[in-house]
């Protein structure tokens, strides 16, 4: 894989000269091979190594380069026609491939080629962009969007209309990451490379970017770009220094462990935020 990485890095340094008509056979194949690794889950844009998330920037660069080597082409889903550079992940799947993959793909769900969808994943009518990784047992509910190169852990629930930000537009340095066993409530948005750590519960309508204040009401601590493990987060506001106004913030109302989550349930956790 090191040779492939080197070729992608060199191509990236010369990306301004790459187009569908000028790209060499070797570089084009390297980009395709990198996307195949992402599509199969053999490689991913980010992975946790020794407790820390490591971003493989060369794979993100391969995703970006793929847009330079392809022309738009007509494609269809049997009902509608589309015109795009990126083929759909499941367009050529056979029934046997679906069985082996172990996922459920509901009509009108869309996943782009170069994304990975694990076993026991359920894709309701939703969108999974190129380079994304959706791990085993995750539910991507109706109208949820998993952005380019986003990393979604095992047994995550992305509720209806959730948006998980990508890295391509606008260009971001690091992907947005949702770790294992997280719950993201309906219409919430997590973007700009924010990391939601394992077991966190995000209520409905919470918006978190790198600049969003994430206030822990128990400790008074303010986090940026990271939701701590086991945090239960709701939308709220914090006052300005002069008290003249308040600005939006995400509020950590409590922290729970996995055992408590399993015993109590998500809805009970969110209903009881003022009980303590």
From Swiss-Prot:
- List UniProt keywords, sorted A-Z: Acyltransferase, Amino-acid biosynthesis, Cytoplasm, Diaminopimelate biosynthesis, Lysine biosynthesis, Repeat, Transferase
**One biological process term in Gene Ontology:** diaminopimelate biosynthetic process
Q: Subcellular location, in the record's words?
A: Cytoplasm
Residues holding substrate: 104, 141
Q: Which enzyme class, named as a word? A: transferase
**Which InterPro entries did the record assign?**
DapD_Trfase_Hexpep_rpt_fam, Hexapep, Hexapep_transf_CS, THP_succinylTrfase_dom1, THP_succinylTrfase_N_sf, Trimer_LpxA-like_sf
Among Gene3D superfamilies, the record links this protein to: Hexapeptide repeat proteins, Tetrahydrodipicolinate-N-succinyltransferase, N-terminal domain
Q: GO molecular function: any one?
A: nucleotidyltransferase activity
> EC number(s)?
2.3.1.117
Q: How does it assemble?
A: Homotrimer.
**Protein name stated in the entry:** 2,3,4,5-tetrahydropyridine-2,6-dicarboxylate N-succinyltransferase
């Amino acid at each position: 894989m090191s040779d492939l990485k080197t070729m992608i890095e060199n191509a990236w340094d010369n990306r301004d000269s790459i187009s569908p008509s000028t790209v060499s056979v070797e570089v084009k194949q390297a980009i395709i091979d990198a996307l195949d690794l992402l599509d199969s889950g053999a490689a991913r844009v980010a992975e946790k190594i020794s407790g820390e998330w490591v971003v493989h920037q060369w794979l993100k660069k391969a995703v970006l380069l793929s847009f330079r080597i392809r022309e738009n082409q007509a494609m269809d889903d049997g009902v509608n026609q589309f015109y795009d550079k990126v083929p759909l992940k499941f367009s050529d799947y056979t029934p046997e491939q679906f069985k082996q993959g172990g996922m459920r793909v509901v009509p009108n769900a869309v996943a782009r080629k170069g994304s990975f969808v694990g076993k026991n994943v359920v894709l309701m009518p939703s969108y999974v962009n190129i380079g994304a990784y959706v791990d085993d047992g995750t539910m991507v509910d109706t109208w949820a969007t998993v952005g380019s190169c986003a990393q979604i852990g095992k047994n995550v629930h992305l509720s209806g209309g959730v948006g998980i930000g990508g890295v391509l537009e606008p260009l971001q340095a690091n992907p947005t990451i949702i770790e294992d066993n997280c719950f993201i409530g309906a219409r919430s948005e997590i973007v700009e490379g924010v990391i939601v750590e394992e077991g966190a519960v995000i209520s409905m309508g919470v918006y978190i970017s790198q600049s969003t204040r994430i206030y822990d009401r128990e400790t008074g601590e303010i986090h940026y770009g990271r939701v701590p493990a086991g945090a239960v987060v709701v939308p709220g506001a914090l006052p300005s220094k002069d008290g003249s106004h308040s600005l939006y913030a995400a509020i950590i109302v409590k922290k729970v462990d996995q055992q408590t989550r399993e015993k109590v349930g998500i809805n009970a956790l969110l209903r009881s935020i003022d009980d303590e």
